A protein has these predicted regions:
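Beta-sheet repeat architectures centered on beta-propellers
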Residues: 1-70, 362-366, 373-377, 384, ...
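Small/polar beta-strand repeat architecture
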Residues: 4-9, 122-126, 130, 171, ...
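Beta-propeller and closely related beta-pinwheel folds
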Residues: 52, 261-413, 440-443
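Blade-loop segments of beta-propeller domains
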Residues: 60-62, 67-68, 76, 81-101
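Extracellular/surface-exposed low-complexity repeats and stalk/linker segments enriched in Gly/Pro
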Residues: 85-93, 134-164, 183-191, 401-410
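Beta-strand-rich solenoidal segments
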Residues: 85-138, 225-226
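Short hydrophobic/aromatic-rich beta-strand motifs
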Residues: 102-106, 156-177, 207-213, 227, ...
Length: 579
């Protein structure tokens, strides 16, 4: 009797020896993984877990970090540099620390410290309220009193050379000086008033821009405004103004107030030796504003100093709607983001400052700390993903993260990598790392970093009250590292009957490490263990693994300790569409 001859199934081998990281999409390539934990691109193309993290220090209340010659951070009320604490009376809010030369500006406290001389620190703002009588008198620009002035509507008769006359024949009154050479009274274009009171000038510096209030004299109401201090002593200040006679305001008439203010800013950055900031909402004076500000050149204390010079402060209103969501300096230009646009400031002094507005994907609200620069490219969290901005238009860099929705992103950069921790819709934190040189994402763990800071050869993060080292320097922070990778659907793209008869994994393991292999078959949700391997010595393995016969499957590899996977080879036996 003759029987039909069985047709031998065609067998093929597919080897993956280049592993390209995380891709959380429905269809992914061989060598990519739908899910992972604690993996890294450091050993690319080899698949390997990351290094263990370390701990730098465990302060009582870390609130912010900045890199100077050494790592500086805020611990409660202290600013700490080189592990030397300076009690600055800081509040307990999260900080934004901005470097400007040797100085560090601490927001929202509006304080500063000189990192070259930590005994030099103070407040950006200053204020004086009089507690005794205040005297107003006409003076020169350096504060010297005028003497023997005539106040009248008619010219003085037979004046001496350089005689002074306040002409009251018209308003506003004018101060004139007699020139014997030309036999003419010449108007003095700019006149100054000395405001004298004990201690009035001690908190301020020459050329500070201040707000003055509380002056009751009708003739001096113009002084209740923003003024520039042209000269000062401990007990007087000199501002622009004119009055006919010496005037005194008694304590009973009320106190005068002199203030050097900094605007209430949503976000702040430094560019070209100026501090830049933005505000959307109610300002100090109660007005609703939508403005961008710049401090005086080289002087972070002055935000309302207008002298007609290239060093002046700067303020400009914006025409776009919505709150500001972040600020950073990129390629020498201050950038101010909203969710749907970016404002870019061009120019190098107030007269030629220009603000260009580009409608594009901006920074998502609540993700202002996601702004970080890697190799001249700015990365940030927009509403629909991570964007890369090179100065023209942003492009998406996070296709591999899939369709998951994330918020509250905090990011840092070190070397070629962009580290970002984000919260998903379930409230779970996830740390992702984007290797910009290799174009690959990797998922680490559920670390919730409050801030990052790259200093020298380490990336620091504040998490759970510790300052940890992401690259592993310092004391031990973690035990044996647990890691995992999970493939996408293997075999689902082919319509023919087939099954994976064998998996061969080439790998090496450190002493004490353990690796477990699991499979999920067809549409089952259960994971079945295939193989467990424990290493008692440092060696490499080639593991033959035989999964069940199925149409498609997923592979999950879990491990504890250091291991490296060099290749995964599939042996596939394949028939036709029917058999």
């Amino acid at each position: 009797m003759r029987l039909p001859k069985l047709r031998e199934l065609q067998a093929s081998r597919q080897m993956v020896d280049t592993f390209r990281g995380y891709n959380h999409n429905l269809r992914i390539s061989d060598g990519e993984f739908f899910d992972m934990k604690n993996m890294t691109s450091d050993y690319y193309p080899v698949l390997s877990p990351r290094k263990k993290r370390g701990v730098y220090t465990s302060p009582e209340s870390p609130k912010g970090m900045i890199a100077k010659d050494a790592l500086c951070y805020v611990d409660g009320s202290n600013f700490v540099i080189n592990e030397y604490p300076v009690d600055m009376g800081l509040n307990d809010e999260p900080k934004q620390l901005i470097s400007m030369g040797a100085y560090v500006i601490i927001m929202p406290d509006k304080k500063w410290i000189n990192t070259l001389d930590v005994t030099e620190f103070g407040d950006i703002e200053a204020s004086f309220t009089s507690t005794s009588d205040v005297t107003f008198s006409l003076c020169t620009v350096d504060g010297a009193d005028y003497e023997n002035m005539t106040v009248s509507a008619d010219e003085p008769e037979e004046p001496e050379n350089m005689a002074l006359w306040i002409d009251t024949s018209s308003k506003p009154h004018t101060l004139k000086q007699y020139s014997a050479t030309s036999s003419m009274w010449v108007q003095i274009a700019t006149t100054y008033i000395k405001i004298s009171s004990p201690g009035i000038g001690s908190a301020f510096e020459q050329y500070d821009g201040v707000d003055i209030s509380g002056i009751v004299s009708e003739d001096l109401q113009d002084l209740n405004a923003s003024m520039v201090i042209w000269a000062k002593g401990d007990d007087y200040i000199v501002v622009i103004g004119l009055l006919d006679n010496v005037t005194e305001q008694t304590v009973e008439e009320g106190a005068i107030k002199v203030e050097r203010k900094m605007p209430e800013l949503d976000f702040i950055t430094e560019s070209e030796n100026r501090l830049w900031g933005c505000k959307y909402g109610v300002a100090n004076n109660g007005e609703v504003v939508n403005e961008i500000y710049a401090s005086k050149l080289g002087d972070f204390k002055n935000w309302s100093c207008y002298m007609g010079l290239a060093t002046d402060s700067y303020t400009a209103s914006c025409g776009t709607d919505g709150q500001f969501t972040g600020a950073i300096t990129h390629m020498g230009y201050p950038l101010f983001f909203k969710e749907n646009c970016v404002h870019k400031v061009y120019g190098n002094y107030p007269a030629n400052f220009q603000i260009q507005t580009t409608a594009c994907r901006g920074v998502q609200k609540g993700c202002e700390r996601s702004l970080a620069i890697v190799n001249e490219v700015l990365y940030y969290k927009a509403r629909n993903g991570i964007c890369a901005y090179d100065g023209s238009l942003p492009t998406e860099a996070s296709y591999a993260l899939g369709n998951e929705v994330y918020s509250d992103a905090v990011a840092g950069s070190h070397g070629n990598k962009y580290y970002v921790t984000m919260k998903d819709v379930m409230g779970q934190w996830n740390l992702f790392v984007y290797d910009t040189a290799k174009g690959m994402w990797h998922k680490e763990d559920d670390l919730h970093a409050e801030s990052f800071c790259s200093c020298r050869n380490e990336l620091y993060a504040i998490s759970n009250g510790d300052i940890i080292t992401m690259l592993g320097s310092g004391d031990d922070y973690e035990g044996d590292l647990e890691w995992m990778v999970q493939t996408g659907e293997i075999g689902i793209s082919s319509p023919d009957m087939k099954y994976i008869s064998r998996l061969t994994v080439r790998m090496s393991m450190d002493i004490g490490s353990e690796v477990r292999f699991y499979a999920q078959y067809d549409f089952s949700e259960a994971w079945e263990e295939l193989f467990t391997l424990r290493s008692d010595n440092l060696r490499s393995f080639s593991l033959p693994i035989r999964p069940k016969r199925c149409d498609h499957m997923k592979i999950r590899i879990e491990g504890v300790g250091m291991a490296k996977i060099y290749s995964i080879t599939k042996t596939i036996e394949q028939g036709s569409e029917l058999s």
